[in-house]
């Protein structure tokens, strides 16, 4: 963010800036840092030395363009070259060559990487910052026990604790603890140095017994004692180099490497002045930590809040990429060592180029982007989704928490999140509170902390300009910070008023003169998703959370429309998403069509290709439409073409439609929604979806697979759309079951499997009858549509390991239908229950039928009243032809500001349009409307308006599923589960209760046995249902009962059954 020259103005930072800064930091600093750590490598005889010259590294611009990388499923990466030297020590000769080390995937203008043709994004992780933390817990006797936990850069922990006898221990694991004197001695301090460097030497001397003195008499003894206790080894181990190496690897490297941030934190917490480049834990640190712990026991010092953001650090793209580079170079080091020793063994003369291979670096990055939990496939449902995905913060991932182990305190909102992490935007479900979103103005500082901007206030007499400061969570505790609601008030009023402020995690009310800093923007605490909700201050936070998640699920519509009521951030979201085409230079439009725009400016001609029907990974359609005419002069930064879900360079996710809040014959019970057929026939909520189907050809042991149109196994009508090569033609309309690509796989058939006529042909004429099975690509259920693109990707090399891939893209036009999910921007979601004819919908006093009917009972209990303000203001805006952009918390101007604005606009609309029903003083905002079926007015006045309603990606076409017959699970013999496996219904516990409630014993028996898991009976059921007979009752048990018997047998419990006749039963009764 930049502070402008004007007083109190600033610009919102680019929403992708976090990703760009991270990648730039990796290229600028991390790359050199890791390359400079690469050691000099010598052979066993110390005759040859290999080294890298870091200063000469070079990244080459990629030869392939982004668009082609996606098209051909390649990685958009840059080649890394470094100069390497091979020195012969005997002759002092040096051979220097420029060598290729490997490919590093690059970041594009959207802040994403393209790996194997797929857009991927690396999200930021929040980890516990390395350093020392003091906490206290109550033991079983109710006495406070103080502990100091040292966390290393790798996440390893070392706990210091004081027992009842005032002895200090270092706890390595739950079971193992080591005396602090032994640990300090093993790290190289003698007793005299220990006692000189502590504030309470008498406490240390109090638990120093003769036995302990002997243990720490020398460094070797201390290391042996430490090794024995750490590794739980009995007997008398002997001091050796390998023992030291094992300790170094298992203990010191994992638990004692603090890193740059850890060293800074420990110096600050323990008041030390150890140099920053000393990144390992020293005896001085441990002794100072023990001193501080003793001070805590005596009531000095403060405990640490582990959930405070000052005790967290952000692991950004730069850190993750740098870690991977370090890992790749360690692998490369092993390769070079092996190659040098191999060359000497075989008496070959090595060269730098022969020693280095590019495989370690390239494979490390490919596996990182493909497998690492923090590298995710970019969600491209709509432009908002793309941007929000890159601004996520995750507590999960390597070194972090898991959804099962994280407690409520970690998930909860903390005062230090203010202006840094959005208190609203988080995922729902098991990861609630563990995946957050960055606030709009937050940025990542040099030490991995989250910084937020504030304005510094000077005294009036100085007349200085307001200065903007970026503060980390540890800094802003010492300032009085005025909350955002003091923003709009002018100076004169502020001086007389007491204002709400934040100080040391408390919210106070103080005089204006005492304020040091103030917030810069009402949206400062929110993420992008929450900032797009108008009137958010009138909504319950749970509903705002749902809304910020649901806006990311909105499908781009075929005809987008910008919202009447917005917040003002829509334009920046659209521009930063990279979806609209923007002019990079000023000039004149020479030519424009649907595929490209030709622009002339500053002496040269520039062709800008437009995106045409590109599929996103959520199957939505990405498409650009030109917005400029031929001959028009344009400026730099002007919109040339709108993309999916943008209009005039503004985000447009939904439609402004006429809505009434009223019950209608029970069709909007429990959040169901009633809509007019106008929304279907007028293509109001029509969206395009593109599905990808692919097939590969392999070389089998019987020979290569063939793509062909000649497939004898299938009837001609299924092959009607194929061209002479056997691939579906562009523009064809295809239905379920049609062949998209004809393919034959060779197979060897047994003599017995030939038909008699085939055997005769072979015997008489010697004709070899071709044996192959068809393995065509067929269109699955629900996939009907038009073929818009076919791609035949042939990888270089053409071997059996590089199969040819054919991809077919099919476009579907989907109108809105019963079962689709729609939602507003206030967490008001619902499923469409009925589509009414236009003439049956309720209509207004000017004769207009409403488009949608919502249930009014969805508002009061959920407390999302913002939708009512938006609804009424939208109606006024549509009548006055105005668009409103409203910042949140407008009550800081005056009481009831939102209501006054809405009513004044409705009143003005009523006057200008001469429609008194728009604003009726008896029930403002409501109106009398009429039943379309009878023409009678409804009893009560109804709220009508024009809110912005989105169509979400949860569509009935993707979810509806039926099964007549299909696969069964081998173990239970019950139908498989799920749409993708063509699964069937399972009657579960709750369904059984429902049926039991009606006493339907026979239906229950059928459902649970014959039709489900009785292998013979279910075949008979199908036959008798078709013929129309009665279902025969089987005598044997169903499969699930047999499974139960088998499981009991495995527990050595035999279950036998025998038949008791009525006669025997009578005899036994008499005997009794």
Swiss-Prot record:
Database matches in CDD domains: RNA_pol_B_RPB2
Catalyses which reaction(s): RNA(n) + a ribonucleoside 5'-triphosphate = RNA(n+1) + diphosphate
Alphabetical GO biological process terms: DNA-templated transcription
Predominant place of localization: plastid
One Gene Ontology MF term: ribonucleoside binding
The keyword Nucleotidyltransferase is annotated on this UniProt entry: yes
One Gene Ontology cellular component annotation held by this UniProt entry: chloroplast
Record-listed E.C. numbers: 2.7.7.6
PROSITE patterns reported in the protein's UniProt record: RNA_POL_BETA
Keywords: Chloroplast, DNA-directed RNA polymerase, Nucleotidyltransferase, Plastid, Transcription, Transferase
InterPro entries per the UniProt record, alphabetical: DNA-dir_RNA_pol_bsu_ext_1_sf (IPR042107), DNA-dir_RNA_pol_su2 (IPR015712), DNA-dir_RNAP_su2_dom (IPR007120), DNA-dir_RNAP_su2_hyb_sf (IPR037033), RNA_pol_bsu_bac (IPR010243), RNA_pol_bsu_CS (IPR007121), RNA_pol_Rpb2_2 (IPR007642), RNA_pol_Rpb2_2_sf (IPR037034)
Coiled-coil region: none
Localization per Swiss-Prot or TrEMBL: Plastid, Chloroplast
NCBIfam families with a match to the protein in the record: PRK00405.1
Family designation: Belongs to the RNA polymerase beta chain family.
Quaternary structure, from the entry: In plastids the minimal PEP RNA polymerase catalytic core is composed of four subunits: alpha, beta, beta', and beta''. When a (nuclear-encoded) sigma factor is associated with the core the holoenzyme is formed, which can initiate transcription.
UniProt name for this protein: DNA-directed RNA polymerase subunit beta
High-level lineage: Eukaryota, Viridiplantae, Streptophyta, Embryophyta, Tracheophyta
The encoding gene: rpoB
């Amino acid at each position: 963010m930049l502070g402008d020259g004007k007083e109190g103005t600033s610009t919102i930072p680019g929403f992708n800036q976090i990703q760009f800064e991270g990648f730039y930091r990796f290229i600028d600093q991390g790359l050199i840092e890791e390359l400079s750590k690469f050691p000099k490598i010598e052979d066993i005889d110390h005759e040859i030395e290999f080294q890298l010259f870091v200063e000469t590294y070079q990244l080459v611009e990629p030869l392939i363009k982004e668009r082609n990388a996606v098209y051909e499923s390649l990685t958009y990466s840059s080649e890394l070259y470094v100069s390497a030297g091979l020195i012969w020590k005997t002759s002092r000769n040096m051979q220097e060559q420029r060598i290729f080390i490997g490919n590093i995937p690059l970041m594009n203008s959207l802040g994403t990487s393209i790996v194997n043709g797929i857009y991927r994004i690396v999200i930021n992780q929040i980890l516990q910052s390395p350093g020392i933390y003091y906490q206290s817990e109550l033991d079983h006797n109710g006495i406070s026990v103080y502990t100091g936990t040292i966390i290393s850069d790798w996440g390893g922990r070392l706990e210091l604790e004081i027992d009842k006898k005032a002895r200090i221990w270092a706890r390595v694991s739950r079971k193992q603890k080591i005396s602090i004197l032994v640990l300090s001695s093993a790290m190289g301090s003698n007793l005299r140095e220990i006692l000189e460097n502590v504030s309470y030497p008498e406490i240390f001397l109090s638990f120093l017994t003769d036995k302990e003195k002997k243990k720490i008499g020398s460094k070797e003894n201390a290391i042996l004692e430490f090794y024995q206790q750490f590794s739980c080894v009995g007997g008398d181990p002997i001091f050796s180099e390998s023992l030291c190496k094992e300790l170094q690897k298992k203990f010191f490297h994992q638990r004692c490497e603090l890193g740059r941030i850890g060293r800074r934190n420990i110096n600050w917490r323990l008041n030390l002045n150890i140099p920053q480049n000393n990144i390992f834990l020293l005896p001085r640190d441990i002794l100072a930590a023990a001193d501080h712990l003793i001070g805590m026991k005596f009531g000095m010092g403060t405990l640490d809040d582990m959930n405070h953001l000052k005790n967290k650090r952000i692991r950004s793209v730069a850190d993750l990429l740098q870690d991977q580079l370090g890992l790749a170079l360690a692998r490369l080091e092993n390769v070079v060592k092996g190659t040098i020793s191999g060359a000497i063994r075989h008496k070959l003369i090595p060269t730098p180029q022969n020693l280095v291979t590019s495989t370690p670096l390239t494979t490390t990055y490919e596996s990182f982007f493909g497998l690492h939990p923090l590298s995710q496939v970019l969600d491209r449902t709509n432009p908002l989704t793309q941007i929000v995905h890159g601004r996520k913060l995750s507590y999960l991932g390597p070194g972090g928490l898991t959804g099962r182990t994280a407690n409520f305190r970690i998930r909860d909102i903390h005062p230090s999140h203010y202006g840094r992490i959005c208190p609203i935007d988080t995922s729902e479900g098991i990861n609630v509170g563990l995946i957050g979103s960055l606030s709009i103005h937050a940025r990542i500082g040099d030490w991995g902390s989250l910084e937020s901007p504030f304005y510094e206030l000077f005294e009036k007499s100085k007349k200085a300009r307001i200065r903007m400061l970026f503060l980390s969570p540890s800094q802003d505790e010492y300032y009085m910070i005025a909350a955002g609601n003091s923003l709009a008030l002018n100076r004169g009023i502020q001086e007389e008023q007491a204002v709400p402020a934040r100080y040391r995690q408390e919210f106070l009310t103080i005089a204006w003169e005492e304020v040091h800093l103030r917030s810069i923007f009402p949206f400062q605490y929110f993420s992008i998703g929450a900032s797009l909700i108008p009137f958010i201050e009138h909504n319950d936070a749970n509903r705002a959370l749902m809304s910020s998640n649901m806006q990311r699920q909105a499908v781009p519509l075929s005809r987008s429309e910008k919202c009447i009521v917005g917040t003002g951030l829509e334009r920046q979201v659209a521009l930063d998403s990279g979806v609209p085409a923007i002019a990079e230079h000023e000039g004149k439009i020479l030519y424009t069509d649907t595929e490209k725009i030709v622009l002339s400016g500053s002496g040269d001609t520039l062709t800008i290709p437009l995106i045409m029907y590109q599929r996103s990974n959520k199957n939505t359609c990405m498409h650009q439409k030109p917005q400029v005419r031929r001959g028009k002069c344009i400026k730099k930064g002007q919109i040339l073409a709108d993309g999916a879900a943008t209009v005039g360079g503004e985000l447009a996710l939904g439609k402004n439609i006429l809505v009434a809040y009223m019950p209608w014959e029970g069709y909007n019970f429990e959040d169901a929604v009633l809509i007019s057929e106008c929304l279907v026939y007028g293509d109001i909520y029509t969206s395009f979806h593109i599905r990808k189907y692919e097939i590969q050809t392999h070389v089998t042991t019987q020979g290569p697979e063939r793509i062909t149109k000649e497939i004898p196994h299938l009837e001609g009508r299924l092959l009607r759309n194929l061209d002479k090569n056997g691939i579906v033609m562009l523009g064809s309309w295809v239905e379920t079951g049609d062949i998209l690509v004809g393919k034959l796989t060779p197979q060897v058939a047994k003599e017995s499997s030939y038909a008699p006529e085939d055997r005769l042909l072979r015997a008489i004429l010697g004709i070899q009858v071709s044996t192959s099975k068809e393995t065509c690509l067929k269109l699955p259920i629900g996939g009907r549509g038009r073929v818009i693109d076919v791609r035949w990707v042939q990888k270089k090399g053409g071997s059996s390991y590089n199969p040819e891939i054919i991809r077919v893209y099919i476009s579907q036009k989907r109108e809105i239908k019963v079962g689709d999910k729609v939602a507003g921007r206030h967490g008001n979601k619902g499923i469409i229950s009925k589509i009414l004819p236009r003439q049956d919908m309720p209509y207004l006093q000017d004769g207009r039928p409403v488009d949608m009917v919502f249930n009014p009972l969805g508002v009061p209990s959920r407390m999302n009243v913002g939708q009512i303000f938006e609804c009424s203001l939208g109606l006024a805006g549509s009548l006055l032809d105005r668009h409103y952009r409203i910042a949140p918390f407008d009550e800081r101007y005056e009481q009831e500001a939102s209501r006054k604005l809405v009513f004044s606009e409705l009143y003005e609309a009523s006057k200008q349009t001469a429609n008194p029903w728009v604003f009726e003083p008896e029930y403002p905002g409501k109106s009398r409307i009429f039943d379309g079926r009878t023409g009678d007015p409804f009893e009560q006045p109804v709220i009508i308006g024009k809110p912005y309603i989105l169509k979400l990606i949860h569509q009935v076409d993707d979810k509806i599923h039926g099964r007549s017959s299909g696969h069964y699970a081998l173990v239970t013999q019950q139908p498989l589960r799920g749409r993708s496996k063509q699964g069937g219904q399972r009657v579960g516990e709750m369904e059984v209760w429902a049926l039991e409630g009606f006493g339907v014993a026979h239906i229950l028996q059928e459902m649970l046995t014959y039709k489900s898991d009785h292998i013979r009976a279910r075949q008979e059921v199908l036959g008798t249902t078709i013929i129309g007979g009665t279902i025969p009752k089987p005598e044997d048990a169903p499969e699930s009962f047999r499974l139960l018997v088998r499981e009991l047998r495995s527990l050595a419990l035999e279950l036998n059954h025998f038949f008791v006749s009525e006669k025997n039963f009578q005899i036994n009764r008499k005997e009794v």
